[in-house]
């Protein structure tokens, strides 16, 4: 079995380490020669360090990883088998039929009336806990985005934040102008907390480890394949920053939750409960509204790199991960084949509500470090959406990931449009319930039916 040797060696090494410590303690009390004692202590320390390094080498663990699950070898083998095999055998399905079935499932689900999650712990405006979660609304924007981000803020304030008063945090790789800062403050209540931060060049610019000549060559190839933003270096910087850097910014150190807000998006329905408190009280670490397939050309080696990482750190895997969502090869089998094993399903991160504790955890941080060393943010066009989604699907319990079906949201060209009760004025009528996109040729880019089918528990389904 793949992981049997580790399970045999770990307890043996632990016993050896304990014996070394015990010998040191005994000698401490038995010897009076200070020089000899120091030599013994130094020798014991050296042996301990050597043994500990051997332990870490064999287990793939760091010191703090001892708190992570120590999976049974048989369980790990089962998970790894699932991650190495497609969900469906080739020639057992017709992608066109799968698409038709998935589209029907999605539309039927969205046409069910909804007002809010059916839980008994929603926090309303006026409740002592309303607006008190450690959360902020985050925007990574340029000075030139002022008009478009104002549009997004005004809608979010009207539909949600005027009742809860959560602060805003704005980040930019350049200094914000007075015009930008004054423009933002002018549309918000005077007591609304607003902070503006600059991203340091080390956290934004292309790392020195990237071979500039290779980057130029690879992006030239992608550009010829009409891959969007391939040759826009700042886009690569943004994807890397939102994958592995933003949650380290000093302005975010005091927060547990972030709600990401992009320029020029639309909100269609009132949200009458504190979303951050919902996350906190219902053990959710991630919230999304749209769930898409990615362009496989941009992430050609992301899955194989991820699997290499998982093989080195199997203890990071969550036994209740969203593995089937990652491995469903039935709607877009070409994506799966191109990436050598990944459906390319991902949460569209232009809207995300995320628990920063997950991003600051050892599995996520180690994963980011590994991907950074691979260089795929620049040699390919790895996006923060597939990167974040892979980490969540592999390292988190899928029940802690929540689809906010009740939130009406649009980012061109896709929409999450719920059906509000007929006697309700919660939604403004500016979107068509269940209509994912106006362009039918983009319907095959919707991965939400796959999430419904494979990842939503009965509890999640009953929540709406």
From Swiss-Prot:
GO terms for molecular function: alpha-1,2-mannosyltransferase activity; mannosyltransferase activity. It is an enzyme of class 2 (transferase). Keywords: Glycosyltransferase, Membrane, Signal-anchor, Transferase, Transmembrane, Transmembrane helix. Residues 33-130 are annotated as: Stem region. It is a single-pass type II membrane protein. Residues 1-11 are cytoplasmic. Residues 131-464 are annotated as: Catalytic. Present with 5240 molecules/cell in log phase SD medium. This is Probable mannosyltransferase KTR4. It comes from Saccharomyces cerevisiae (strain ATCC 204508 / S288c) (Baker's yeast). The lineage of its organism: Eukaryota, Fungi, Dikarya, Ascomycota, Saccharomycotina. The gene is KTR4.
């Amino acid at each position: 079995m793949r992981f049997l040797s580790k399970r045999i060696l770990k307890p043996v090494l632990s016993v050896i380490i304990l014996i070394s410590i015990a010998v040191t303690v005994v000698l401490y009390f038995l010897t009076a020669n200070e020089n000899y004692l120091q030599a013994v202590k130094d020798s014991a320390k050296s042996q301990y360090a050597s043994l500990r390094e051997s332990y870490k080498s064999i287990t793939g663990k760091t010191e703090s990883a001892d708190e992570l699950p120590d999976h049974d070898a048989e369980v790990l083998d089962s998970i790894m088998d699932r991650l190495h095999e497609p969900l469906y055998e080739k020639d057992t399905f017709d992608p066109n039929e799968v698409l038709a079935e998935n589209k029907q499932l999605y539309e039927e689900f969205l046409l069910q009336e909804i007002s809010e999650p059916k839980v008994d712990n929603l926090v309303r405006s006026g409740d002592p806990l309303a607006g008190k979660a450690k959360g902020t609304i985050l925007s990574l924007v340029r000075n030139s985005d002022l008009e478009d981000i104002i549009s997004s803020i005004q809608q979010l304030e009207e539909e949600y934040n005027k009742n809860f008063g959560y602060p805003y945090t704005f980040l930019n790789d350049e200094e914000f102008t007075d015009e930008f800062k004054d423009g933002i403050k002018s549309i918000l209540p005077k007591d609304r907390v607003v902070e503006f931060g600059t991203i340091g060049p080390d956290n934004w610019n292309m790392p020195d480890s990237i071979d500039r000549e290779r980057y130029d060559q690879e992006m030239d190839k992608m550009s010829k394949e009409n891959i969007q933003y391939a040759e826009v270096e700042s886009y690569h910087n943004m994807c890397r920053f939102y994958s592995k850097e933003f949650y380290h910014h000093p302005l975010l150190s005091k927060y547990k939750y972030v709600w990401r807000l992009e320029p020029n998006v639309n909100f269609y329905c009132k949200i009458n409960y504190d979303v951050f408190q919902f996350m906190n009280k219902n053990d959710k670490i991630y919230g999304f509204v749209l769930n898409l397939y990615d362009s496989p050309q941009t992430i050609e080696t992301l899955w194989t790199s991820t699997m290499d990482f998982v093989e080195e750190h199997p203890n990071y895997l969550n036994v209740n991960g969203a593995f089937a969502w990652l491995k469903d090869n039935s709607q877009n089998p070409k994506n799966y084949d191109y990436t050598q094993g990944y459906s390319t399903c991902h949460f569209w991160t232009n809207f995300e509500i995320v628990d920063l504790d997950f991003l600051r955890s050892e599995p996520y941080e180690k994963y980011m470090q590994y991907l950074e060393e691979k260089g795929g943010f620049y040699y390919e066009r790895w996006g923060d959406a597939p990167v974040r989604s892979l980490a969540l699907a592999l390292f988190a319990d899928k029940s802690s990931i929540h689809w906010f079906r009740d939130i009406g949201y649009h980012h061109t060209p896709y929409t999450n449009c719920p059906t509000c009760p007929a006697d309700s004025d919660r939604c403004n009528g500016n979107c068509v319930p269940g209509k994912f996109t106006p362009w039918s040729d983009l319907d095959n880019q919707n991965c939400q039916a796959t999430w419904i089918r494979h990842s939503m528990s009965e509890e999640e389904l009953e929540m709406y």
